[in-house]
Amino acid sequence: MAVQKSKKSRAARGMRRSHDALTTAAVSVDSASGETHLRHHVTADGFYRGRKVINK
C-alpha cells in the first residue's frame, strides 16, 4: 500500500477538494410539448427544438 511521507495540511486537503463540487444539470422546457429535458438532448416523446424527430 502507498503511505504518505508526511501529513497533508488542511489547506492542501481543501485545495484538492476544491474541484469535487457537483453542479446541477441544465434543464430546458420543450416549446412544443412543455416537457423538461436536458439541454441539447431529445425529449422522451421524441421532440427536439419544437419538431418531432423520432417516431415511436
From Swiss-Prot:
UniProt keyword annotation of Transmembrane helix present: no
Alphabetized Pfam families for the sequence: Ribosomal_L32p
Region span, Disordered: 1-22
GO molecular function: structural constituent of ribosome
A single GO BP: translation
NCBIfam families tied to this protein: rpmF_bact (TIGR01031)
Family per record: Belongs to the bacterial ribosomal protein bL32 family.
Protein name from the UniProt record: Large ribosomal subunit protein bL32
Protein source organism: Photobacterium profundum (strain SS9)
Name of the gene encoding the protein in the UniProt record: rpmF
